[in-house]
Amino acid sequence: MTAFQRHRGATLPALALTAAIGLGAVSACSGSGTPAPTTSTSTSGGSQSSSPSGPTGSTASTVRLAAVGDMNNDGNTSPTSATGEVASSILAANPELVLGLGDYQYPKGTCSALVEDYDKVWGKVLPLMFHIAGPNHDWNSTSDEEGYRRHFAGTCPGQTTGPSALVRSEHTPVGPGDFWSRDVGAWHLVGLSTGLWRFDQGKAEAMTRTLDRDLAAAKARGKYLLVAYHDPYFTSTTDQHGPDKAVKPWVDVIDKYDVRLTLSASQHNYERSCPILESDACTPDTGPGTTAFNVSTGGVNLRSFVNKPPYIVKRFSDTYGWLALSLHPDGSFDWRYHPVVGSSTDSGTRPAPRE
């Protein structure tokens, strides 16, 4: 059985599009200092603030997520395009949450392009979306945040969609360089901004410290961990991109706390790694190590591979689609790639970690 098919008898919590959206509230502001443990938080750059939050859904429940990045081509408004079919397929599957993995609108996510193009095909998904930003297409510098910040807050001129689930839960806009995290059932989700390594290394280093504190607190609460960031570290090379070595400090922290899986995009193809350590060594499914998914098949042009790292165990570059994940209370998870244009797919289960 694969993602979105088995639920181990658990009753899945409905996604309420309120401040809590069934997952707990978050706070967002600029600040400094070491945060107290909290179920959820959002920060600007690398400085973290926290606030009390309520229950984040039963820890006995399986959580159903969809994930994809690299979505809409310049000028496209067609619901029957590849990206339109991906969006429709996600909505038909009725996930509780959609993780947007960055690069939403090409070539540049300005307010006008997002409203006039992106929202025509992805607007109905926005209320379900938690999101991270990709550098260049979503923002180009620390002073280039308006399109991303305003669109996901639902405040671009002429916008009739949004705000996103993430912004709605926070009651405040979220910028492309912001950190966010939250508990979802037995799991803890984190969103990072790889653009900071290009645009403001000081903030990227601060975010590394924030990540370390956040994962330590989540681990102490007994949570299983998922981290999303746009530019992948564990990936094959294409004619445009190779592994993003700048994010290695984050990979070290991810390895330190035995994060179960990461989600990235950017490469315009699909990949899955073995459970892998920061040293590039594969480990058993029930051991430590992170399963790294690259899901950048949301509708923009696909790219072939020019090498094959030994840790990549499944990949293809000929099929548009999205990844379904079922995160179970014992730390196991199922995945299934849903093809919508093309026929390649991937599915499986990683069992619960050994105690």
Predicted regions and their residues:
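Bacterial N-terminal signal peptides that target proteins for export
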Residues: 2-16
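C-terminal motif of bacterial Sec signal peptides marking the signal peptidase cleavage site
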Residues: 25-28
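Short, low-complexity, disordered segments immediately C-terminal to signal peptides
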Residues: 30-55
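N-terminal active-site segment of His-dependent metallophosphoesterases
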Residues: 54-113, 117, 205, 236
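Active-site-proximal beta-strand elements of phosphoester/diester hydrolases
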Residues: 62-75, 186-196, 226-230, 290-296
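Extended active-site neighborhood of metal-dependent phosphoesterases/phosphodiesterases
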Residues: 109-221, 240-250, 255, 261, ...
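Short acidic, glycine-rich surface-loop motifs adjacent to enzyme active sites
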Residues: 218-237
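A short C-terminal boundary segment appended to hydrolase-like catalytic domains
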Residues: 303-355
